[in-house]
């Protein structure tokens, strides 16, 4: 008799906890096998991720290997390319193999979560730091150390202020916690750099609501958090959205431009694109599940976590996309999958939210418990730490985090970069009208192609007034002359219409110049064309 296969898509809280719950229930059974597919081989404990920025905990303390959590589960570290519901098949993108891998399932669990989606806001994908996983946290930390270092040595006052201005978009849990840790980190570290004063630092939080945590916490706790962060130097801009981002600005909905080299966006998120391509009922981009976690209209497909729309067991709306709900949903899902296999009745999900917590940095936090009790300050911070410490998966992780917290008190912060913020070989940039793309005399480290938009080319006359000497349109190259001649720009470029450019590092293209045919082709791209 062949084994029944349960395939779980996603290794977040919902996915890995479903696998763990199934393993516990299948200890004495050998007729069922569990397969989990994830793009990472670890679970990120996201509630503590902001502490990676400040260095309060070690780099790897927020992650736990999936195989340690679910040792009896077959794990594929692959990208899912397709799900064929009719043939009960999951297709995995190739890795070292040249062909796709196809896996048959008897039961499918969809726990893919959501993804950061910057597509609706021009420039955000190119110039904002998302904050969803460990890589994002490490990249942001490296960047913060780099801009502080550059600010301490630059002689350009405008650039210095730009480097020391930090903008965070979003006033929900993620945005507030990131803002609090970032503010603590940069102000504390600024005092350690020669020629930097912490008072020069600006940290600005932009939020669409009229106060932070306006949907997440009672008004009294939200106001407490707001006043506390203001006291620490954080500035707030309310009832405003970030409209677009460029290499030098965060542009707000009212047209205001904030000069900055650091924009962190905790919003927006959207359904995982794969979910939209699975042949199951959807609403608001999420899979419609019942209280049993069974997808409507199916008997062997289950959905839970952020990607699922599950009715609230108390009859008010839907279950929130939080870790505490995902963990309990996983328990119900595992129970009901085995109930279907064993021909037993299903169990409905029942859970009452225990509470909500937010860390505000510097040993302060806010807590809403059992929808009745409000706590704030140092006591709330102690409870916040203990609650999440207990929830950390794995005893070894608890030990490591405890040691990190203790050594942080004794030794302070480590300003060490991990190399996660290295410039990419190919980048995309967005510019707004009137913005300078290139300044005359500026050394250009990149060769760029104007993908869309329009720019004008300026040259400074002997009397120091600029003269327009030409225009660039979609398809034209920027910096090709300087690349071929190994010189700095003898002209400036200013954006006329909203433009997007694709840029390539000169050092990556340099080896191509040794090929005569390639160099001849590049010569034809010089500006002006008759040169």
Predicted features and spans:
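FAD-binding core/adjacent interface of flavoenzyme oxidoreductases
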Residues: 2-3, 74-165
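Cyclic-nucleotide recognition modules
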Residues: 362, 469-528
């Amino acid at each position: 008799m062949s084994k029944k296969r349960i395939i779980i898509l996603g290794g977040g809280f919902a996915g890995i906890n479903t696998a763990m719950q199934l393993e516990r229930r299948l200890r004495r059974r050998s007729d069922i096998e569990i397969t989990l597919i994830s793009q990472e081989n670890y679970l990120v404990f996201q509630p503590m991720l902001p502490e990676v920025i400040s260095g309060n905990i070690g780099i790897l303390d927020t992650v736990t290997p999936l195989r340690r959590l679910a040792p009896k589960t077959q794990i594929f570290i692959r990208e899912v390319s397709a799900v064929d519901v009719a043939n009960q098949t999951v297709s995995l993108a190739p890795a070292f193999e040249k062909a796709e891998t196809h896996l048959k399932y008897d039961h499918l669990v969809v726990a893919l979560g959501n993804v950061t989606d910057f597509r609706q806001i021009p420039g955000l994908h190119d110039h904002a730091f998302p904050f969803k996983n460990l890589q994002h946290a490490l990249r942001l930390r490296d960047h913060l150390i780099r801009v502080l270092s550059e600010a301490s040595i630059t002689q350009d006052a405008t650039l210095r202020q730009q480097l020391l201005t930090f903008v965070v978009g979003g006033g929900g849990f993620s945005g507030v916690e990131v803002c609090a840790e970032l503010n603590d980190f940069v102000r504390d570290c600024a005092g350690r750099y020669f020629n930097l004063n912490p008072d020069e630092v600006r940290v600005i939080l932009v939020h669409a609501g009229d106060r932070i945590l306006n949907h997440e916490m009672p008004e009294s706790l939200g106001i407490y958090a707001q006043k506390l962060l203001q006291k620490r130097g954080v500035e707030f801009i309310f009832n405003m959205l970030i409209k677009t981002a460029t290499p030098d600005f965060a542009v707000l909905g009212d047209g205001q431009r904030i000069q900055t080299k650091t924009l962190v966006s905790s919003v927006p998120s959207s359904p995982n694109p794969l979910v939209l391509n699975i042949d199951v009922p959807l609403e608001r981009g999420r899979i419609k599940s019942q209280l049993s976690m069974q997808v409507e209209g199916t008997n062997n497909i289950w959905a839970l976590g952020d990607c699922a729309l599950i009715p609230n067991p108390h009859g008010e709306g839907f279950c929130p996309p939080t870790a505490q709900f995902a963990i309990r949903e996983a328990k119900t899902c595992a129970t009901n999958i085995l109930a279907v296999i064993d021909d037993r009745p299903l169990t409905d999900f029942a859970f009452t939210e225990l509470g909500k917590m937010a860390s505000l940095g510097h040993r302060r936090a806010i807590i809403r418990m059992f929808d009745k009790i409000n706590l704030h300050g140092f006591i709330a911070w102690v409870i916040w730490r203990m609650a999440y410490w207990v929830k950390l998966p794995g005893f070894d992780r608890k030990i490591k985090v405890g040691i990190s917290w203790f050594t942080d008190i004794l030794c302070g912060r480590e300003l060490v970069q991990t190399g996660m913020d290295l410039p990419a070989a190919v980048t995309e940039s967005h510019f707004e009208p009137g913005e300078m793309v290139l300044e005359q005399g500026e050394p250009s480290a990149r060769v760029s192609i104007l993908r869309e938009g329009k720019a004008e080319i300026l040259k400074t006359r002997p009397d120091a007034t600029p003269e327009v000497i030409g225009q660039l349109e979609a398809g034209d190259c920027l910096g090709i002359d300087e690349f071929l001649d190994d010189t700095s720009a003898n002209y400036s470029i200013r954006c006329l219409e909203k433009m997007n450019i694709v840029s390539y590092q000169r050092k990556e293209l340099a080896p191509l110049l040794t090929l005569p045919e390639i160099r001849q082709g590049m010569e034809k791209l010089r500006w002006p064309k008759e040169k």
